[in-house]
Amino acid sequence: MTIQKNWQELIRPNKLHVVPGSDPSRFATLIAEPLERGFGQTLGNALRRILLSSLQGAAVQSVHIDGVLHEFSSIAGVREDVTDIVLNIKDISIKMQGEGPKRMVVKKQGPGTVTAGDIQTVGDIVVLNPDLPICTLDDGAEIRMEFTVASGKGYVAAERNRPEDAPIGLIPVDSLYSPVRKVSYKVENTREGQILDYDKLTMMIETNGGVTPEDAVAFAARILQDQLNVFVNFEEPRKEVATEIIPDLAFNPGFLKKVDELELSVRSANCLKNDNIVYIGDLVQKSEAEMLRTPNFGRKSLNEIKEVLAQMGLHLGMEVPGWPPENIDELAKRFEDHY
């Protein structure tokens, strides 16, 4: 037995399916299937921990408020005390280019609410939640705050953000650098061929908008990959790749793809299976009338299949010369490896 069989013969996900949320830059559901049994929990837990703790982001490190000496002060004409203001500042979401530290300032007169959108930023800093309230000013009140922003990862407590030579009046802030706000996942059974107990991993991710959920998972997977490399204590033997002659076909090689790859609804997929329609080449030769004569196959399934085929530049009722070819299963496998 070659060592490569330890990983080459495990089933791997066909692809990552991304379902965007109401705001695709912040919310998404990602689905990976099929996975070997147990791998859904293993990968889901590892990715969740990395997403919440290890991705780089930006956050406020400290704030200086004119006329304020420490966080237990109050400010004339400002309804919130400084402790509450600092808690609100901690929730400011920021996207920053470069390392920092950098400065941003807010100055406002009352009456009214000071929000994160009032902050004056330089071109390489973007406030991602401008509607966040920071404090409320009465008539005649005025406030000026200067923030120090830096990049980092995970969570850093306020005390660790206090420089040794901190001037009087500099108030450190808890920093939540991670651009990922929430991650949850679930593992369900899924089917591949005749095997019913593979894993399906579904991850629900919310970010602050500084990175998309899809990119966040990609970064987390890359971190995990990099950390695991140290455990690989061998080099794979070089595989001699023989030059394979790919035969010329009288039809589109795409017809050799299986209809399972079309991501149809369960009802439509089952109808095709029951009618022994395995390959796209089998499907496109069928007319609409033939399809509607298939048991349990209705107009809704027909429209679904027509739409999917149209996206591929195909349609029902096509003539496919030379279909089905001899040794179709072998041909399908060979073209799967090359296209």
From Swiss-Prot:
It catalyses: RNA(n) + a ribonucleoside 5'-triphosphate = RNA(n+1) + diphosphate. The keyword Nucleotidyltransferase applies. Its EC number is 2.7.7.6. Residues 251-339 are annotated as: Alpha C-terminal domain (alpha-CTD). GO terms for biological process: DNA-templated transcription. InterPro entries: DNA-dir_RNA_pol_insert, DNA-dir_RNA_pol_RpoA/D/Rpb3, DNA-dir_RpoA, RBP11-like, RNAP_asu_C, RNApol_insert_sf. Homodimer. The RNAP catalytic core consists of 2 alpha, 1 beta, 1 beta' and 1 omega subunit. When a sigma factor is associated with the core the holoenzyme is formed, which can initiate transcription. This is DNA-directed RNA polymerase subunit alpha.
